[in-house]
A protein has these predicted regions:
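Non-catalytic terminal/accessory segments
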Residues: 1-169
Length: 169
C-alpha cells in the first residue's frame, strides 16, 4: 500500500509492524489496553544510570550538593515525561532515591560513635541509637532500616528541597 498507492519508499531495516507495547517513541511507550502513554522501561534504565553516577560513593560532598544535582536531573526528566501519571512507579522511584541518600549519610558518618550521636540527635532514644549504630550491617541495609527512616523521614527531604517525582502528578 505505501509503496504502490502512496508512491513512498520505506526503509525495511527501520520499518516494522509490532504491538504498541513494544514501541518506543521519544522515550514513551503505549499501554496495551488503554493506549495511555507510559515511560518506556529503557528510559527508566537511562535515568537510573544517571542517578547511579550521582550516588557514587567516591564523589564525596554534602547532602545539599547531591540534592541540587538530583533536582536538576529529576525535574527535567519528570517535566519531559509528564504525560505518564502512574502513582506506583514514581512512588517506588522516590523511595529508592531517598534510600540512596540515607545510604550516603550512613557512609559519611563512618564510625559507630558518630552514628550513635547523630541518631540520638535526630530523635532516637539512647539505647536504640547505640543498638542501630553497632548492628554491623551494611550501609544499604541500614538505609532502609526503621532507625534511619525515623531519623530521616520524608519531611526531612522536603525541607531540604529534594524534588519529588510523585508530586508532579
Amino acid at each position: 500500500f505505501i509503496e504502490e498507492t502512496l508512491k513512498l519508499r520505506g526503509n525495511c531495516d527501520k520499518s516494522d509492524v509490532f504491538r504498541a507495547r513494544r514501541a518506543k517513541f521519544l522515550g514513551y511507550t503505549f499501554a496495551e489496553k488503554t493506549g495511555r502513554t507510559l515511560v518506556h522501561p529503557k528510559s527508566f534504565k537511562r535515568l537510573k544510570d544517571k542517578l547511579r553516577a550521582v550516588f557514587c560513593r567516591a564523589r564525596g560532598g554534602s547532602l545539599l550538593r547531591t540534592n541540587g544535582e538530583l533536582n536538576a536531573i529529576l525535574c527535567g526528566w519528570r517535566q519531559y515525561f509528564r504525560l505518564d501519571n502512574r502513582k506506583g512507579v514514581f512512588e517506588a522511584l522516590d523511595i529508592h532515591i531517598r534510600r540512596h541518600l540515607r545510604k550516603l549519610v550512613w557512609i559519611a558518618w563512618k564510625r559507630p560513635r558518630t552514628r550513635e550521636r547523630e541518631l540520638h540527635r535526630r530523635g532516637l532514644d539512647g539505647f536504640r541509637a547505640w543498638e542501630s549504630a553497632n548492628n554491623g550491617r551494611g550501609a544499604w541495609w541500614n538505609a532502609n532500616a526503621r532507625h534511619m527512616r525515623d531519623a530521616f523521614p520524608l519531611s526531612f527531604f522536603k525541607r531540604h528541597g529534594l524534588y519529588s517525582l510523585l508530586a508532579m502528578r
